């Protein structure tokens, strides 16, 4: 984790002003997101990727003036940075989604609901990814600022952004889309069996492209700057440092994948999460080998055979499970098609990051893992990982 330089007491005062009741807030001269009187900014993050972005930006060392506490989906809290009793500024982060879980559905725990009801900032991915957002904010009475890290809340933004913003004026919370925005792509896949319409109008899995991750981090940084304007330069410098790593990650990924002839870059997965990744790196993304996300383990023999025939005709040499899916039917398809099944610890990180200690515990680690395993499975050569990304290098036991 990188160290955040110490915040000034003036910055702490700015954060403290964010904490006050409406009359006191006016006296402070602020009309922005509120926090508690102790100078604590309370944040909630929807996805595992966003939780990691914020963690990478906020984890200072013990000599800093910032105390940072992150509570995971399991309810366990980790402390980073300054001792809470000595810190002049405090940030708490509650992460909703668990590692190795779908990013689309989520049942809020009692503790998570309480955290969201008290939150100043709610960081979300957007593009209609999180189907649970409306129920979460409605049931908790959230009244802070929802920060849409992708810059696009959903399909309604694409249709008529002005009209959507007008509707949001009636909501009890604010919506901040930031200044950066991903270029959303239309959802390319047909409806699942038994459904009349596709699940999405636009692909919500924006983070699979490191370039889009840069957009998300930029908007997160802007929200932090608004929370502590006297420290805008400090937050901006930390965002710049992390973005520099993401750019190196992007360049490294391109170098590794370009070692594979483009006609060999054929990707079948167990979930349709890799559209943006594939577009950026010249991969032919066939989507999920089996379209039924929730019942893949129960695919019929006929369905297995049909899918295997499709895999064989595509020229694919491997099919890849994702960490958030049951790999049982993927294994069956691979066996019938005569190709490699990439599963278990080698599976790709798609909807979510991985558990502590896994390659995909962090966003950068997840991309290093995915690109390394894809490149090796396709017969390419993984380029040397840059020195400042080496701490996130995949384990040697991954795909050979």
Language model segments and positions:
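Extracytoplasmic metal-acquisition and chelation regions
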Residues: 2-14, 18, 27-400
């Amino acid at each position: 984790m990188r160290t955040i330089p110490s915040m000034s007491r003036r910055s702490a005062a700015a954060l403290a002003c964010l904490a006050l009741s409406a009359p006191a807030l006016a006296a402070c001269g602020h009309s922005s997101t509120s926090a508690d009187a102790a100078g604590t900014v309370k944040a909630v993050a929807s996805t595992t990727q966003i939780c990691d972005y914020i963690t990478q930006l906020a984890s200072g060392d013990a000599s800093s003036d910032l105390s940072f506490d992150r509570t995971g989906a399991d309810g366990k809290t980790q402390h980073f940075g300054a001792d809470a009793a000595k810190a002049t500024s405090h940030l708490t982060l509650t992460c909703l989604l668990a590692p190795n879980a779908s990013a689309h559905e989520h049942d809020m725990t009692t503790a998570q609901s309480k955290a969201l009801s008290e939150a100043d900032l709610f960081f979300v991915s957007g593009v209609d990814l999180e189907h649970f957002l409306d129920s979460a904010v409605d049931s908790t009475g959230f009244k802070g600022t929802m920060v849409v890290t992708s810059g696009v809340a959903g399909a309604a933004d694409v249709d008529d952004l002005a009209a959507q913003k007008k509707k949001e004026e009636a909501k009890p919370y604010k919506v901040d889309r930031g200044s950066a925005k991903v270029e959303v792509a239309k959802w390319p896949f047909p409806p699942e069996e038994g459904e009349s319409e596709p699940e999405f109008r636009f692909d919500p899995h924006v983070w699979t492209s490191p370039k889009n991750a840069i957009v998300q981090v930029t908007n997160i940084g802007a929200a932090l700057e608004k929370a502590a304007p006297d420290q805008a330069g400090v937050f901006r410098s930390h965002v710049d440092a992390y973005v520099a790593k993401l750019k190196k990650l992007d360049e490294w990924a391109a170098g590794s994948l370009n070692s594979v002839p483009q006609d060999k870059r054929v990707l079948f997965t167990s979930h349709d999460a890799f559209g943006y990744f594939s577009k950026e790196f010249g991969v032919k993304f066939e989507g999920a080998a089996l379209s039924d996300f929730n019942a893949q383990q129960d695919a019929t023999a006929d369905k297995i055979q049909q899918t295997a025939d499709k895999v064989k005709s595509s020229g694919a040499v491997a099919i890849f499970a994702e960490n958030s899916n049951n790999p049982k039917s993927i294994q069956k398809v691979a066996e019938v098609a005569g190709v490699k099944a990439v599963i278990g610890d080698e599976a790709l990180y798609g909807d979510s990051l991985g558990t502590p200690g896994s390659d995909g515990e962090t966003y950068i680690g997840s991309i290093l893992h995915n690109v390394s395993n894809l490149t090796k499975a396709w017969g390419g050569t993984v380029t040397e990982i840059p020195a400042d990304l080496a701490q996130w290098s995949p384990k040697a036991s991954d795909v050979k």
